[in-house]
Amino acid sequence: TNIGPGNKFFSFCVIGEDTPDLKYKGEKSSLEIGNNNVFREFCKVHRGTEVDLGYTKIGDNNLIMPGVMIAHDCVIGNGNILVDNSALAGHVQLGDHVTLGGYTLIHQFCKLGSYSFTGLSAHITMDVPAFTRVAGMPTKQAGLNTIGLERKGFTKEEITNLKKAYKIFFREGLKVDEAIKKIE
């Protein structure tokens, strides 16, 4: 486990332990932690597996709240907030500035784009596009993450343009390549 400067670890964190993945047979693997992250009480972060990346990676300036579990081979970007008792199964990828509502569960191999937001108790089983919100039971698209974008300093013009792109991509019933052409 390699840990950068400025990280804070609170009571009962489990950092860099063997993964419980059944394919793991004790081979060399690692956990890479960037700078200035906060790991609150009872969070757990596993190393990677040789079958995939061979490492788990956490970027810089993340807040990992109590009870959060980050499984093997996850890649976490920068500036994310993982709220209490959220769980990331193996091979999950988070972009930058993602917020996970409390008790969010993310199925293995899912990707959450930068500036996305999950509501309380979301059960993520598919990728979540950048800049969007998902919420509810079952979890569904809930629109653009406008509040998060405003808090991160996006201009009104940038948010308006993202709203237009979101509408074209998710509300007009176009095929992906058609939506991309229309947005361009």
How does the language model describe each region?
Residues T1-K140:
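Structural signal for interior beta-strand "rungs" in well-ordered beta-sheet cores
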Residues G6, F12, K23-Y24, K28-S30, ...:
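Terminal amphipathic alpha-helical/low-complexity segments used for targeting or macromolecular assembly
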